[in-house]
Amino acid sequence: MKQTIVIKIGTSSLTQPESGKLALSTIAALVETLTQLRQLGHRIILVSSGAVGVGCSRLNLKERPKKMAMKQAIAAVGQGRLIRVYDDLFNTLGQPIAQVLLTRRELIERSCYVNASNTFESLLELGVIPIVNENDTVAIEELKFGDNDTLSALVASLIHADWLFLLTDVDRLYSADPRLVPDAKPITLVNSDEFAQLQVKAGDRGSQWGTGGMATKLAAARIATGAGVRTVITHGGKPSNLLKILQGEAIGTQFEPQTRNDSARKRWIAYGLLPTGKLYLDSGAIRAICHQGKSLLAAGIIKVEGQFEASEAVQLCDETGQEMARGIVNYNSLEIDKIKGHHSDEISQILGYGGAETVVHRDNLSVNG
């Protein structure tokens, strides 16, 4: 069966650990595997890190820079070199590619989100493999994805992918870092119920040249599986394993997807937008929005956290602060603070002007899986 597959490869797999130079044999093996998948009829998107690492190597820098402006400059140097290597290798196999550089802004603005989706769809229809990276050179700190694990999960949600492969420097998820804890236990399959209870010492440390660690991969897997995408963590040095996994072999760690039938708009609310505040809700409101498909009314709001404007996204939390849903609000934070706990027919009297009966309409609300 033809499937849509997103593959993310990190800096630790793309580069040699000591020098930061490109690991050309690994990249060549990856290119060969992805071309094989295309020839089998699958739709392929590659999310590739490495621009900053390659830039550092090209400029003979011994460590990754800390300052944002310097990282952006070095990314500009490295991205050109990286995409050229990919193009040369794919070209030898007759496989066309495209470079797609994204910032978080493209996913926050609804029109840009739709345009990005349409562009990916057109590229895939043409048989092209898009190679995606964050546009580090122009991204601002507040609107950065933070790591390409998150970016790959958001792209997988955007294009309704069937699979997301997170290629890393270990063969699967373990109960602790196997490089530090010799008796760490391997984890091969995680269903949605187990994922909610999963407790592993994942750490937050990436490689010298990259930004990701196992913690970011677990966060990405939560996003992707929540959007209905089966997710796999496996070794980036063995790209041929992708074919074996698709054929049913138990390699790496697989995270089973949740069953979701959300509209494209609700996926955008859940994964594209950045929440700018929180609303704490009572149990009745939680039940209404999560289990009865209703809108959020002011009466069910206990507390407002953060400053935000109308039409921005917020997290909808239970009384303990656990996020249960996300939604686009009809009022700003000051207005909601005034009307919280009151019935809808009291809103105009409290504010002195008329407004929506709902704080978040159900069409602008996405419940967590």
From Swiss-Prot:
One Pfam family matching this protein: PUA
Enzyme class name: transferase
Taxonomic superkingdom: Bacteria
CDD domains documented for this protein: AAK_G5K_ProB, PUA_G5K
Domain named PUA: residues: 276-354
Principal subcellular localization: cytoplasm
Pathway(s): Amino-acid biosynthesis; L-proline biosynthesis; L-glutamate 5-semialdehyde from L-glutamate: step 1/2
Name this polypeptide is given: Glutamate 5-kinase
Organism for this UniProt entry: Rippkaea orientalis (strain PCC 8801 / RF-1)
Lineage summary: Bacteria, Bacillati, Cyanobacteriota, Cyanophyceae, Oscillatoriophycideae
